[in-house]
Amino acid sequence: MQTLDVYQSLWAMEQRHPRKPEPSAEENFARIAEAGYTGVCLDPSVPEIPETRALLPLLQKYGLNCMLNVFPHSVAELRPLLELADEMNAELVNIIGGVMPVAVEEAVPVAEAWLRTSDDFSFPVLFETHRDSLLNDLFYTLQLIERVPDMRLCADLSHFVVNREMRLPLRDEDRAYMSTILNRSDCFQGRAQIGRA
């Protein structure tokens, strides 16, 4: 039987209100647990490893699973981020790669190196479609996944929809492109907005 696990991104809990203090990490974890989410999604780059590691006791206290969206800015930076994910018992890791060669051919060895690094870990490692990252562009992504057949994706389609200014009804070509992305995806990122006064 299939199940759907839903994780709340910790960054999305930020209020960003100029006259209100931000809730503490503990308050956010408590709210996430109370709302019934499977777990929390954390978003570290290498310099943020210590502060991310410090959240492990809150995951344990509130019985929440962990997934990481990691931001490596070199091929070598992926390993310490995956080691952090292993320490935190992450269920899943999404790479939002800060290595962005202009030519697809130059991205192939980057993706392949990250896949080899991920082979040393037991959790799934996916590549997220995301603005300002390796998979910034729909056409670039389609070409790269064709050249690297083992790449599995986390689809954040909003970046492609906005980037391409897609309109409804979708053109047949756009539908086919999106179907290709979805067929290579094991995870999805999405946003829900609740209007607040």
Predicted regions and their residues:
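Structural preference for beta-strand elements that scaffold enzyme active sites
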Residues: 3-7, 38-41, 63-67, 91-94, ...
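Glycine/proline-rich, flexible active-site/cofactor-binding loop segments
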Residues: 77-126
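Acidic/histidine-rich catalytic cores of soluble enzymes
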Residues: 120-196
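Aromatic/hydrophobic pocket-lining residues that form the small-molecule binding cavity
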Residues: 25, 52, 77-78, 104-107, ...
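Short, solvent-exposed loop/turn segments at secondary-structure boundaries
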Residues: 17-20, 105-106, 165-168
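N-terminal pre-domain/capping segments
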Residues: 1-86, 90
